Amino acid sequence: MEGKIMNIKHKIPILLLVLYIALGVFIQYNGISEFKSLPSPIYGGDYYYQMGVIWHIRDGGNPLESSSMIGGMPGYLPLYAYLCAKFCDLLNLDTMKGILYFSVVLFIMTSVIWFYLFRVLFKDDWVALIEVVLA
């Protein structure tokens, strides 16, 4: 009996992590699902530049080249744009919706990655869970 209780105690942080991720996905999805455009350039034109980079990759451009000038280096690290472009292609989304919905995927991935990183560092699931929520 005591072994079962200890086993359940070890699973509670994982269950709470899943609940945290589900709540975060629900809040984030409801926040962005009604967007008709990316947030205003007043927050920075980075969103629109990234959308151009993603369009460039989706149209067959090399992710390791600049999307804005021939022979130039990319203005940003290309991993985000490449992953987002492939996400858009996989789900047949337009680029703007792909950027918005890919943020939900990134939230899920980073929450899990942070949890396992903090679990290894602190060797405690509860501390890892708290750190994920604070991160």
From Swiss-Prot:
One of its GO terms (cellular component) is plasma membrane. It is a multi-pass membrane protein. Keywords: Cell membrane, Membrane, Transmembrane, Transmembrane helix. It is found in: Cell membrane. It comes from the Archaea. This is Uncharacterized protein MJ1080. The chain crosses the membrane at residues 12-32, 68-88, 98-118.
